[in-house]
Amino acid sequence: MRVNEIKAGVVGIGFIGVAHVEALRRLGVDVVGVVGSSPERARAKVESSSLPGVYESVGALAGDPEIDVIHIASPNHAHTDQVRTVLEAGKHVVCEKPLALNADDTADLMRRAESSGLVNAVCFNIRFYPANHQAMALVAAGEIGEPRLITGSYHQDWLLLDTDWNWRLQPEEAGQLRAVADIGSHWLDLTSFISGKRIVEVMADLHTLVPVRRHPAGPVETFATVDDTTELIEEEMTSDDAAGILLRYEGGARGAVTISQVSAGQKNSVRYEVAGGKSALGWHSAEPEDLFIGHRGRANEILSRDPGLYAPEASKLIAYPGGHVEGFPDTFRALFSQVYADVAQGGPSETPTYPTFADGHDVVLVTDAIAQSDREQRWTTVQR
């Protein structure tokens, strides 16, 4: 089967679901239909956009014999049951992070996926900026020496105001962790991917900095703002707006990260530095084309995205020549291109080049340890 013969469906048509549809179309995948939070809301959105037709339910989508792959981009609480439905129907599946709300469920989904022989992936798309694959290749080749210190941040501002609202603020839909699970999970996955080291212990301090929020009675799109004339309801908040986390990685490397969705002016700012015994690597999502390489005894370097200068595993992600900027939407295309190469061959490669349910499970093990560490205010071991 060729990639342009594959048919897909997408569950969830908010901000991220639409990003999935757009990336799949760039690959030539036929997106047959979508499922929304309700058929009525989905039809209204389809009528005002270029989205495909609406299916009544995940079961109906999974039951369509024409569909080969289903993407789950719905609110977090729905992932477990929806992924099970898709796997039971014999469809390949791509799920947004977090894979599920707890490690028991992620372990179950991982086992089901592995025993099914179906392609399974978790959408840790930030790995797929080419600079981040280049960083991974440099670390793996020993160019920076053994990683010693891994630091950084993931900051946003879209939940700064007490009138900012989204389903992610509701624990019954998003889980008890919010900033850590929503965006921190990307950073945790990314730094383990680059360093080749899993996180083994954590010490976390989580903060609810906006204790009471005012919101409309109905749903609010991700990153949307509330109109001044809207009648608002007050609700107490319990999930984390921000976090500071100390980390210990395999092999002895130490780490520290701050995570925030209430940092004014930071729209979607991801940063890391991996300091090794020879040199250091650094990257910032605001300048995604450039990888910083720091040296002690000679001039520092900025390695810009260029397929002729990058390692093979990084250059194959690049769709345009150097100097033609690629960004956030391109990470989905790059990730899905690797997933769909396996779909086209009928099943997962022996060593997939994309994050699988095993990676999704491992990140939830880490975030579970972060939640426990904050509750108990102590160092906590990741339970593998």
Regions found by a protein language model. Give the residues of each.
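N-terminal Rossmann-like dinucleotide-binding module
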Residues: 1-49
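C-terminal helix-rich "cap/oligomerization" subdomain common to oxidoreductases
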Residues: 1-3, 69-71, 284, 324-325, ...
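Beta-loop-alpha module in the N-terminal Rossmann-like domain of NAD(P)-dependent dehydrogenases
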Residues: 49-112
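Rossmann-fold dehydrogenase core element
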Residues: 108-126, 145-149
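Predominantly a Rossmann-like dinucleotide-binding segment in NAD(P)-dependent oxidoreductases
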Residues: 126-236, 291, 377
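C-terminal glycine/acidic-rich active-site capping loop/insertion
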Residues: 211-240, 244, 248-251, 278-354
